[in-house]
């Protein structure tokens, strides 16, 4: 068998394996949080755009929510504006919020939209302020030490949390064969802007749309046990146990809680996948092995 025949045979095997998954997910909505290394490498960026376009072409409805922390940090540095973080959240005063909106809504969002469209998609860029897509309120952060009689409220500026999602707008775009690409900026009741964690926005969008899947691209291979082995399939109960015994800790906790809340809020499954792997999204949804950790509400028998 020639090399060309071998390659063709491999393609046929891949398509054969993917077909049952394509049939299962036709007409379903998948919310994908795009960030980390997957946004930095040209090869990975191109692969992501092609994945999104292919999903739409076979009848699946992708909705993209993106981050942009490093890009925000770079511009703040160039403008000689100091970055401060509390509990992993960027303290966002009015000046920093202007930069956040400029970078997320004006630069990163349009770059992603352009990339998807160059590969044959019809992407539309949005921030949460468009048609009040992401309604938000100020996030209350508290801290308490054993010496304190009551928690101290810490002001981290215009950092918000999601209180509502304009699903009518997203459903209209999806039905019109568009691919929504959302920057995680929320709008308050008086029109004020809020900087919101992209994972949290993706989770709330997935819940509101009753999405089939929430997919979070990360810079790790997936959730791991204490032996460093990737845990490919978990129930919400098992994840709770891993948090309780300290297997899941630190910076992964907010991401995992977001995935858990989405599943508990009606999303069929959440996926923590390795965005460093080319075509990670397709590998996770269209192959038997996947490239990360799937979390579901289904109990194991």
Swiss-Prot record:
Marked site: Transition state stabilizer: 33, 255
Binding-site positions, substrate: 68-69, 90, 195
Domain of life (superkingdom): Bacteria
Alphabetical UniProt keywords: Amino-acid biosynthesis, Arginine biosynthesis, ATP-binding, Cytoplasm, Kinase, Nucleotide-binding, Transferase
GO cellular component, one term: cytoplasm
Chief location category: cytoplasm
Signal peptide: none
A Gene Ontology BP annotation from the UniProt entry: L-arginine biosynthetic process
Described purpose of this protein according to its UniProt entry: Catalyzes the ATP-dependent phosphorylation of N-acetyl-L-glutamate.
Full protein name: Acetylglutamate kinase
Origin species: Pseudomonas syringae pv. tomato (strain ATCC BAA-871 / DC3000)
């Amino acid at each position: 068998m020639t090399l060309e025949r071998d390659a063709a045979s491999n393609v046929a095997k891949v398509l054969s394996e993917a077909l049952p998954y394509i049939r299962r997910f036709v007409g379903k909505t998948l919310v994908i949080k795009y960030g980390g290394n997957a946004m930095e490498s040209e090869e990975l960026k191109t692969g992501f755009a092609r994945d999104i376009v292919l999903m739409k072409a076979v009848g699946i409805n992708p909705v993209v929510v993106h981050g942009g922390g490093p890009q925000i940090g770079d511009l703040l540095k160039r403008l000689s504006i100091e970055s401060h973080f509390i509990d992993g959240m960027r303290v966002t005063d009015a000046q920093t919020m202007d930069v956040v909106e400029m970078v997320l809504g004006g630069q990163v969002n349009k770059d992603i939209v352009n990339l998807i469209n160059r590969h044959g998609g019809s992407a539309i860029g949005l921030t949460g302020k468009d048609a009040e897509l992401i309604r938000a309120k100020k996030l209350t952060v508290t801290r308490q030490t054993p010496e304190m009689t009551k928690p101290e409220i810490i002001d981290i500026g215009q950092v918000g949390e999601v209180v509502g999602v304009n699903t009518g707008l997203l459903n209209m775009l999806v039905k019109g064969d568009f691919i929504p690409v959302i920057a995680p900026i929320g709008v308050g009741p008086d029109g004020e802007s809020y900087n919101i964690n992209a994972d949290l926005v993706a989770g709330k969008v997935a819940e509101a749309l009753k999405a089939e899947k929430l997919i979070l691209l990360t810079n790790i291979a997936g959730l791991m046990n204490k032996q460093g082995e990737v845990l490919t399939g978990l129930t919400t109960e098992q994840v709770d146990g891993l948090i309780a015994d300290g297997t899941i800790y630190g910076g992964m906790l907010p991401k995992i809680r977001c995935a858990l809340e989405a599943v508990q809020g009606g999303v069929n499954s959440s996926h923590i996948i390795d965005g460093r792997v080319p075509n990670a999204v397709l590998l996770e949804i269209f192959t038997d092995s996947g490239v990360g950790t799937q979390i579901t509400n289904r109990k194991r028998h």
